Amino acid sequence: SYKVSGGLHGVGVSVVNALSKKLHLTIHRAGQIHEQEYAHGDPQYPLKVVGETDTSGTTVRFWPSELTFSQTIFSVDILARRLRELSFLNAGVRIVLRDERVNLEHIYDYEVGLSEKSALDIAGLPGKLADCQEKDPALSELYLVEGDSAGGSAKQGRNRKMQAILPLKGKILNVERARFDKMISSQEVGTLITALGCGIGREEYNPDKLRYHKII
């Protein structure tokens, strides 16, 4: 898998390579340092050994192509949000973002991450949420019910136009007394956060994005 995996679905580095005017790889593996360089997706020379090492890891450097992108300056805010999401999903992985243009550094290091099925996953709304048809939050209601059986009854009796139903498993975590890492690892808390839509934390929380103005 090491030889064929290039990231998510095995295409990550391949796509970056194709969209870059230059991409340089430095790989520390099995006691050797390997290097290779590409220009607009084409290898400039075969993978070669340039030294010895007692560490492991890969450094990828790339320069976006002006032929493809009209804007090649990276947005630190976008990168910071994405890396923060990745740090939640990958417990124990330390991610460092440095912007050397302004001497800025962000460090993301969560001891307890989130599973891929957690509701903080960016995939979309929780699967058990029976959403309403109304798109205006001021006219939308969210009903929180305990258990799938109660959720089924509530879904049958609701007004589909304006009433959404979200079944939750059992008693939800008391977040007022819980540590932050325990809170975000709770599947039910994550489900609720995603359904409400306004995010969490000082950087991400935005009450204007609340999807329902009435929560019962």
From Swiss-Prot:
GO terms for cellular component: cytoplasm. It catalyses: ATP-dependent breakage, passage and rejoining of double-stranded DNA. Gene3D superfamilies: 3.40.50.670, Histidine kinase-like ATPase, C-terminal domain (3.30.565.10). It is found in: Cytoplasm. SMART domains: TOP2c. Residues 140-216 form the Toprim domain. GO terms for molecular function: ATP binding; DNA binding; DNA topoisomerase type II (double strand cut, ATP-hydrolyzing) activity. It holds the Pfam family Toprim. The record marks 171, 174 as: Interaction with DNA. InterPro entries: HATPase_C_sf, Topo_IIA, Topo_IIA-like_dom_sf, Topo_IIA_B, Topo_IIA_B_C, TopoIIA_CS, TOPRIM_dom. Heterotetramer, composed of two GyrA and two GyrB chains. In the heterotetramer, GyrA contains the active site tyrosine that forms a transient covalent intermediate with DNA, while GyrB binds cofactors and catalyzes ATP hydrolysis. Few gyrases are as efficient as E.coli at forming negative supercoils. Not all organisms have 2 type II topoisomerases; in organisms with a single type II topoisomerase this enzyme also has to decatenate newly replicated chromosomes. A type II topoisomerase that negatively supercoils closed circular double-stranded (ds) DNA in an ATP-dependent manner to modulate DNA topology and maintain chromosomes in an underwound state. Negative supercoiling favors strand separation, and DNA replication, transcription, recombination and repair, all of which involve strand separation. Also able to catalyze the interconversion of other topological isomers of dsDNA rings, including catenanes and knotted rings. Type II topoisomerases break and join 2 DNA strands simultaneously in an ATP-dependent manner. Belongs to the type II topoisomerase GyrB family. This is DNA gyrase subunit B. It comes from Acinetobacter venetianus (strain ATCC 31012 / DSM 23050 / BCRC 14357 / CCUG 45561 / CIP 110063 / KCTC 2702 / LMG 19082 / RAG-1). The lineage of its organism: Bacteria, Pseudomonadati, Pseudomonadota, Gammaproteobacteria, Moraxellales.
